Amino acid sequence: MSANDRRDRRVRVAVVFGGRSNEHAISCVSAGSILRNLDSRRFDVIAVGITPAGSWVLTDANPDALTITNRELPQVKSGSGTELALPADPRRGGQLVSLPPGAGEVLESVDVVFPVLHGPYGEDGTIQGLLELAGVPYVGAGVLASAVGMDKEFTKKLLAADGLPVGAYAVLRPPRSTLHRQECERLGLPVFVKPARGGSSIGVSRVSSWDQLPAAVARARRHDPKVIVEAAISGRELECGVLEMPDGTLEASTLGEIRVAGVRGREDSFYDFATKYLDDAAELDVPAKVDDQVAEAIRQLAIRAFAAIDCRGLARVDFFLTDDGPVINEINTMPGFTTISMYPRMWAASGVDYPTLLATMIETALARGVGLH
């Protein structure tokens, strides 16, 4: 459909959320916040939930059902709506069809998909590949950048190859579960042990003695067979949002800071899942109190990191600010959009309100279209 045709009516947006990853619930909460803030005068919104088992269902787009209430996490349940599929056929023009196979009734047709999916089977290039095959424009990074951004090892490799500062790390692939002596000496203690392709701090452990490493690796492997062991970096935790405009230019937001020292009374606390989403315990400063020159240097590093992995649309780049300068921790190609998430808060502090931010992402997706760029 042409841009002129879309001007005559509201743009039809499919917000896709949930999914098969262990970040299912946070995806639901992000989607609830997005559904609440999309401008209904400009966008006709369809909510598509993916169950933990992988079924796609057409839901009623009620954002109130997609919140954390009394520490209870939301979930897309089987039978909560009509099951559907997106045929990988560009001739179908973004049609969502009913299941079971053979029914084929066209339920909806969409102009653009907003894949609010966190973790594997969504944020990692898989749904982006499906949308490319189906010929449907979508918000956010393409297949390559999504896959790279999901994998902490390859993110660090690409950033380092581009001359960007990253911390020391080692990778454990099955069946290996221990570090070599030289790796232990290079990393030092403490270290953080993480699923290499995970997010929301799920499965992450802080290890302060090497005898704790096997248990930490086993915990991480409940979520991903590949484990990354990162040297602890002493410094302030800063974040920066990058946003692509419809004309392809990139802008970086004001910085945000996460302060977690002593959270829940422990000096070894870190920004784990409970601190992020359940306990409301971390302190978030937006804008961060950082010298103007340092802040601008970090903003430029964020844009360079975005370009280094060939990202598109949006990303949140996480840093440590050390005595020796900033170090890039990771890139989130589909950051959280919950009510407490840093990405929309940083843009709000930069003068871009939530509805405008979402509209810009959708406009950029439509301007980009699909295919090779």
From Swiss-Prot:
Keyword presence, Metal-binding: yes
Entry keyword set: ATP-binding, Cell shape, Cell wall biogenesis/degradation, Cytoplasm, Ligase, Magnesium, Manganese, Metal-binding, Nucleotide-binding, Peptidoglycan synthesis
Binding residue positions for ATP: 184-239
Pfam families linked to this entry: Dala_Dala_lig_C (PF07478), Dala_Dala_lig_N (PF01820)
Entry EC number(s): 6.3.2.4
Reactions listed under catalytic activity: 2 D-alanine + ATP = D-alanyl-D-alanine + ADP + phosphate + H(+)
Keyword Iron-sulfur belongs to the record: no
Domain ATP-grasp: 156-363
Entry superkingdom: Bacteria
Pathway participation: Cell wall biogenesis; peptidoglycan biosynthesis
Role description: Cell wall formation.
Family: Belongs to the D-alanine--D-alanine ligase family.
Listed HAMAP family: Dala_Dala_lig
Protein's name in the database: D-alanine--D-alanine ligase
The organism of origin for this protein: Mycobacterium tuberculosis (strain CDC 1551 / Oshkosh)
Taxonomy of the source species: Bacteria, Bacillati, Actinomycetota, Actinomycetes, Mycobacteriales
Gene encoding the protein: ddl
